[in-house]
Regions:
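Acidic surface patches and DE-rich sequence motifs
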Residues: 33, 312, 344-345
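Short, Gly/Ser/Thr-enriched beta-strand-loop segments that form substrate-interacting elements
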Residues: 337-345
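Conserved beta-strand segments of alpha/beta enzyme cores
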Residues: 140, 231-233, 295, 320, ...
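Short, surface-exposed beta-strand/loop micro-motifs that present aromatic residues
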Residues: 348-350
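Beta-strand-turn-beta hairpins that frame and shape the catalytic cleft
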Residues: 205-210, 315-318, 335
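RNA-binding accessory domains that recognize and position tRNA/RNA substrates
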Residues: 2-236, 258
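Cysteine-nucleophile active-site neighborhood
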Residues: 252-331
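Phosphate-binding active sites in nucleotide-utilizing proteins
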Residues: 209-280, 287
Length: 350
């Protein structure tokens, strides 16, 4: 593979108006990609090394929501906005499973890769700093990385696996000498789905019931359905939802390759023979497509941001959408009687 390519530490960190002696850590760390590229930085958060798939997200805000999004399971999340952590982490209600400001009950990303970590935070609803939260959840991070250079490499070469190696972590050598972890090689859906049905009531008598097939569902989906006057029956990814009573079925978002969840595809295929409406979001869309006879494929670097433009096929109408997935539906594989409804305006994918 040749000598490793070493990218310099981000100069933006050195020139920041934030005093470097107030930053949380002097621990040396580096991000190592499978193509040999190496990015030097400093560790923060939990003191552990980790391996996974390196991806990037281009949103300017929303790091608590992104970190807790189950679609990031097994991934080292790179945030392209240069200053992260300045508004802290929202307060959490232990009695509310649908906490606003979070997409699940825990951080799902393997690690966080950023340019600058804000040493201070300020927000009326903040209860802790970003670093304190990462430590509590056992999630490592690295700052001082030139995230623009890293993003360009991922954009131009496709998503790569990588290792975050922290010099002082007790597991550094073990992670450094182990194969790169690839979430696409296993069924990560089973790792993030609920394990038994959960009924969320909206409080309206006679409300419609939506069956939410949880393949890694974000809590904002449940909150949105409840706000629209629907009861939500959340069921595990491999649950036989066809036998459940309900007015519609929503196939949730989630992590990984849709082809690693054949049980869900089989259930959807049986449901398509009925008359009940089915809808899919991100991974759910891909699972629905597989059940209908389409093929799916891995995108070069995925769609991960709050500003993905989608065009309704056959019209000039465009919606700006929030997306987080690394796979897409192959529109050229459409079976008879099916056609694409929306495509991504950036790359034409479904």
């Amino acid at each position: 593979m040749g000598d490793p390519i070493v990218e310099p530490r981000s100069s933006a960190l050195e020139s920041s108006s934030l005093s470097s002696d107030r930053l949380s850590s002097k621990r040396a760390a580096h991000l190592e990609l499978e193509d040999g590229t190496r990015y030097e930085g400093r560790a923060f958060g939990a003191n552990r090394s980790i391996s996974g798939e390196v991806v990037f997200a281009t949103g300017m805000v929303g790091y608590p929501e992104s970190l807790t999004d189950p679609s990031y399971r097994g991934q080292l999340l790179t945030l392209t906005y240069p200053l992260i952590g300045n508004y802290g982490v929202p307060a959490r209600n232990a009695d509310d499973p649908l906490n606003p400001g979070f997409e699940s009950s825990r951080i799902q990303a393997q690690a966080l890769v950023i340019q600058n970590l804000s040493p201070d935070y300020s927000h009326w609803n903040a209860s802790s700093s970003l670093e304190q939260w990462l430590i509590e959840e056992g999630i490592p991070g690295v700052q001082g990385i030139d995230v623009r250079a890293l993003t360009r490499r991922l954009r131009d070469n496709g998503t790569l696996r990588g290792r975050l190696l922290i010099d002082e972590s007790p597991d550094r050598d073990e992670v450094a000498n182990s194969p790169y972890q690839d979430p696409g090689s296993r069924n990560v859906v089973a790792e993030v789905s609920c394990t038994e049905p959960i009924l969320h009531r909206c409080g309206n008598e006679g409300a419609v019931r939506v069956i939410l097939v949880d393949c890694g569902a974000k809590t904002s989906i449940v909150r949105s359905l409840i706000a629209r006057g629907a009861d939500v029956l959340q069921v595990p990814w491999d649950h036989d939802f066809v036998a459940e009573a309900g007015d519609a079925v929503l196939l949730s978002n989630g992590p990984g390759d849709p082809k690693n969840a054949p049980e869900t595809v089989d259930n959807i295929r049986r449901a398509l023979a009925g008359s009940r409406p089915l809808m899919g979001i991100c991974l759910g869309n891909q699972l629905l497509a597989l059940a209908a006879g389409f093929d799916t494929y891995k995108l070069d670097f995925g769609h991960r941001s709050q500003n993905q433009p989608c065009v309704e096929v056959g019209t000039a109408r465009c919606w700006v959408t929030s997306q987080n997935h690394g796979y897409a539906v192959d529109g050229t594989s459409a079976p008879e009687g099916w056609e694409e409804w929306f495509i991504n305006a950036n790359d034409g994918s479904n």
